[in-house]
Amino acid sequence: MNNRIKEAFAHGKAFIPFITCGDPSLEVTEQIIIEMEKTGANLIELGIPFSDPTAEGPVIQAANIRALSGGVTTDKVFEMVKRVRKVVKVPLVFMTYANVVFSYGIERFAANAAEAGMDGIILPDLSLIHISEP
């Protein structure tokens, strides 16, 4: 199996830009993601907007609020990723909050992320205490 994330770090350093999906719109987000890859991104972090982005600074907090005010939903982000994945080959990783995943449904979120072509997820507010040993 091909591991795009592992390949992104094959040469040690990687350029990893971030964008909040839906700010200013999902259509613009798609174009920005494509340009990020064209300009050398090795991996791209896609922020799923959340109403209480406590781990973010004021700029990304404001981007989350603008995206949500514009009607962005997790389902719409998945649909956008499906479209962009047809042309973007670098790894795509969601950066969002645990509540987004939990309220959506863990299994449903994972299935939709895989179907859309996502390579991973970062949940900065999920404590390791919540992780059980296999």
Identify what each model region corresponds to.
Residues 1-16:
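N-terminal amphipathic alpha-helix/helix-capping segment at the start of soluble metabolic enzymes
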Residues 15-28, 93-105:
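Active-site mouth loops of central-metabolism enzymes
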Residues 17, 47, 113:
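Conserved, mostly hydrophobic/aromatic
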Residues 27-35, 103-112:
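Short, acidic/polar
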Residues 45-72:
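Glycine-rich, proline-tolerant flexible connector loops at the mouths of alpha/beta enzymes
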Residues 70-71, 118-128:
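Catalytic beta/alpha-barrel core
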Residues 129-134:
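Residue-level detector of conserved catalytic or cofactor/ligand-binding positions
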